[in-house]
């Protein structure tokens, strides 16, 4: 058996994985989540897809995946999938599974300390993992560049942009091209950070926001956002049953509302950033 395993490992990728393509036969062209399991039942990898069938088949083409996923494919014994009503629902379920299962081949969604925040410390700005009003931010590198752009600025981060842009024009006019390029990159990082913070602040300030991703006709999964987090989720069926679920969701959101939420952490950060990305999508994919 060990010799056979060595032969399999030395074969070209497509040949090694050809026998496993049948594991994804029948996966539908619908949104959902999927799990790769080893022979002993261990969950190796969790993913989500807008089209389960297309995504799962893509793993068995000639293009290599990143090393951890390649290792999971090598140990793969069975694939499970779960059809859900929308890509947003699939993304939220993926977050839950990642936190619960912590599969070894997943690189994201399993460490609550991966978020960073901007904070003024003394006379300068720094990047910290301690929750505060200026975050959460996904990219430590961009946050560090934004902090360097702010320097000793004493005020809201976004208010520093006009003076920084004026400084950039002055440096460029003086033909200090290396300094100008460095400052340009820092300003770009600060602009990204400020845009992300503004989007998060809008979500955190909502009394109640009902997000209903487009799904198959006949039912909708609605998410009730309040106090900077998803306070409730309800399936809205046609007719009086759907109206009752809507009122129940609104009541749950009202109970969960926080008068002033300026900090976000942990699971709420995951869901809030995910919601922010989906709220940028145009109708009819999303209705708010």
Regions found by a protein language model. Give the residues of each.
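N-terminal cationic and glycine-rich segments that engage phosphates or anionic surfaces
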Residues: 3-288
């Amino acid at each position: 058996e060990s010799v056979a395993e060595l032969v399999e490992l030395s074969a070209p990728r497509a040949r090694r994985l050809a026998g496993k393509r049948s594991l994804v036969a029948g996966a539908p062209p619908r949104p959902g989540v999927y799990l790769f399991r080893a022979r002993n039942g261990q969950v190796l990898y969790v993913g989500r897809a807008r089209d389960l069938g297309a995504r799962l088949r893509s793993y068995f083409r000639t293009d290599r995946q990143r090393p951890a996923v390649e290792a999971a494919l090598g140990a793969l014994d069975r694939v499970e999938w779960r059809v859900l009503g929308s890509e947003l629902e699939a993304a939220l379920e993926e977050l839950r599974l990642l936190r619960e299962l912590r599969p070894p081949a997943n690189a994201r969604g399993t460490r609550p300390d991966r978020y960073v925040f901007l904070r003024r410390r003394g006379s300068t700005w720094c990047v910290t993992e301690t929750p505060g009003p200026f975050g959460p931010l996904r990219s430590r590198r961009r946050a560090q560049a934004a902090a360097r752009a702010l320097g000793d600025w004493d005020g809201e981060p976004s208010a520093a942009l006009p003076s920084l842009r004026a400084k950039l024009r002055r440096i460029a006019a003086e033909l200090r091209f290396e300094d100008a390029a460095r400052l340009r990159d820092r300003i770009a990082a600060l602009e990204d950070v400020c845009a992300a913070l503004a989007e998060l602040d809008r979500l955190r300030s909502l009394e109640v926001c009902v997000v209903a991703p487009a799904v198959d006709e006949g039912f909708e999964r609605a998410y009730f956002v309040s106090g900077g987090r998803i306070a409730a989720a309800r399936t809205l069926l046609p007719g009086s049953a759907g109206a009752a679920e809507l009122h129940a969701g609104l009541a749950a959101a009202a109970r969960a509302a926080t008068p002033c939420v300026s900090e976000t952490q942990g699971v709420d950060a995951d869901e809030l950033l995910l919601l922010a990305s989906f709220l940028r999508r145009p109708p009819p994919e999303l209705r708010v």
